Amino acid sequence: MRKQSLVTLLMVLLSLVWLPASAERIRDLVTVQGVRDNALIGYGLVVGLDGSGDQTMQTPFTTQSLSNMLSQLGITVPPGTNMQLKNVAAVMVTAKLPAFSRAGQTIDVVVSSMGNAKSIRGGTLLMTPLKGVDNQVYALAQGNVLVGGAGAAAGGSSVQVNQLAGGRISNGATIERELPTTFGTDGIINLQLNSEDFTLAQQVSDAINRQRGFGSATAIDARTIQVLVPRGGSSQVRFLADIQNIPINVDPGDAKVIINSRTGSVVMNRNVVLDSCAVAQGNLSVVVDKQNIVSQPDTPFGGGQTVVTPNTQISVQQQGGVLQRVNASPNLNNVVRALNSLGATPIDLMSILQAMESAGCLRAKLEII
C-alpha cells in the first residue's frame, strides 16, 4: 500500500514538471509543394477622376497610353496634340492567381497610381490585361476602384486620412487562361514544413506511415517530406484530405528572442529561460545648446560691422549604473517580471539582452531583424 502511494505521488510530481506538447494538424504545419499563388501584373488607365488625375505635362506616358488606347478604338489623335487631362491616371494593377484557378473565375486586384495623381478615388479602371512572369495574359481587370482613404483641401490647407493613391477592386479581374500544372502526375507529392525542423519532419513522416502504411512518407531533409500518392486526381484529393487532418504532438520550439532594431520591439517565446546575473545599465546623454550672439556697432555711422558670433555649450550627463540582481527565471512570466524590474527602456533592453547572451545568462537564440 505504501509503495503504491509513493508511485502515485511520483506520477503527480512528474505531471507538474512535464511540459505537454500541443497537438496540431499536419495541414497547419506544412504546405504542399507546387500549390501556391502566382503573381500577375498589368499597366492600365483609371478614368473618371474629379480633377485629381495625372498632370500630363509631367507624366507624358499617361498621354501616350491614352493616345494608344484611343487609336485601338478607332479614334485618331493628331500628332503634337497637347492634351491637358486632369481626370486620367496611369496605374499599375497587381493580382494573385490562386492555384487550380479555372477560366471564368474572378479574383481581387490592387490598383496603384504610378504618376502624380492626387487621388484615384471614384475612378474606373479600364480593361487591363494581367500577365504572368512568362508574359502570357492570364486575366483581364476592369471596374470601379474602391479607395479606403479620404482627403480635402481648401485655402492652402489640406487634410488626408490614409492613402488616396491606391485602391482595390473586389472580384475585378476575370481569369481567361488556366495555369498549366503537373501536380501529382508522377505519384509523388512533397510536403514542406513552415520552418525547418528535423524532429518535426520525422514526426510528420512517422504519423503518415502509421496511418497510410510503412513507406508512404519519407523525410528528405529538415523541411521536406516526400509522400507517395495514388495516381488519379480524385484519389489524390482524398489521400491528401486524410493526411492533412492527422494530429501531431508538436514539441515546444527553440527558445528565441526577436529584436527589431528599427522600432525597438522585443518579442520572446515561452521557452526563454534566464540564469541569475547582475546587470548595471548607465544612460549617457549629450546635450548641445547653440545660441547666436549679435554684436552691432554703437554708432550708426562709425564704420563698424555687425558680427554674429555663435555660442555653443555642450553638456554630458550620465545616470544610472547601479548594479542590479536578476534572479533565475524558468518561465516566461518570471522572465518578463525580471526584465521589467530593471526599469530599462526598449532600446536599453536590446543592449542588455545582447550582453546577457554573451555572458551565457540568456538561454535563447537572439535574432536581430
UniProtKB/Swiss-Prot annotation:
One of its GO terms (cellular component) is outer membrane-bounded periplasmic space. GO terms for biological process: bacterial-type flagellum-dependent cell motility. The keyword Nuclease does not apply. Keywords: Bacterial flagellum, Periplasm, Signal. Disulfide bonds: none annotated. InterPro entries: Flag_FlgI. GO terms for molecular function: structural molecule activity. It comes from the Bacteria. Residues 1-23 form the signal peptide. Pfam families: FlgI. It is found in: Periplasm; Bacterial flagellum basal body. Assembles around the rod to form the L-ring and probably protects the motor/basal body from shearing forces during rotation. Belongs to the FlgI family. The basal body constitutes a major portion of the flagellar organelle and consists of four rings (L,P,S, and M) mounted on a central rod. This is Flagellar P-ring protein 2.
